Amino acid sequence: MNNLDDLIKVENYDIRKKLNCDNENFQACYSHMLFCMALTNQDLKDLNQEIFRILKKDGFNIYTVRNHMDGDFKKGTHRGEDMYEMNGFIVHYFSENKIKNLLDGFTNISIENFDEGSFPRKLSLVINKKK
C-alpha cells in the first residue's frame, strides 16, 4: 500500500477570503458540494473568481452541487436566496441558471445530473474550463 502523506499537504481555509495560492498555479480544482455551503451568491462569485485566479490557462473547475430537483429543496427554514436550513445545517441549492451565472471567465463543458446516496440526493456535476 502506498503512503501519500509526503505528497499531500492539507491546509484549512476560510473560502470566503483570498486563497493562499499563487496565480495560475493549478491545472484543476475539484470540490464536492463546497458551493452548497451557507454562502451567499456574492460569496459564490468571489470563490469562483479565486478559483479562476489560481487556475492556469485552460484549467478546469470541477464541482458538484445539490440541485433544485433534490427532495430537500424548499424544505426547512428559508435562509435567503436558494438556501434552506434543516436540522441545524444550511444547504445552498442550484438551478442550471445559477450554475451558468458563475461562468465569468469560464466556458461550461458540461452539467451532468446524478443521484447520490439512498435518499437519493440530486446533484449536478459541473465542468468549467478557464478561457
Model-derived features: where do they sit?
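A short acidic, Gly/Pro-enriched loop at the edge of an enzyme's catalytic core
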Residues: R16-C29
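A short glycine-rich, Lys/Arg-flanked "PGG" loop and its adjoining helix->strand segment in the class I
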Residues: K45-K57
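A short SAM/SAH-binding and catalytic strip from SAM-dependent methyltransferases
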Residues: Q27-Q42
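Hydrophobic aliphatic residue packing
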Residues: I8, C29, I51-I54, V65
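Short conserved AdoMet
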Residues: L39, K56, D104
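Class I (Rossmann-like) S-adenosyl-L-methionine-dependent methyltransferase catalytic domain
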Residues: M1-K18, D46, F60-K131
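Surface-exposed loop/turn positions
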Residues: N25, D58-G59
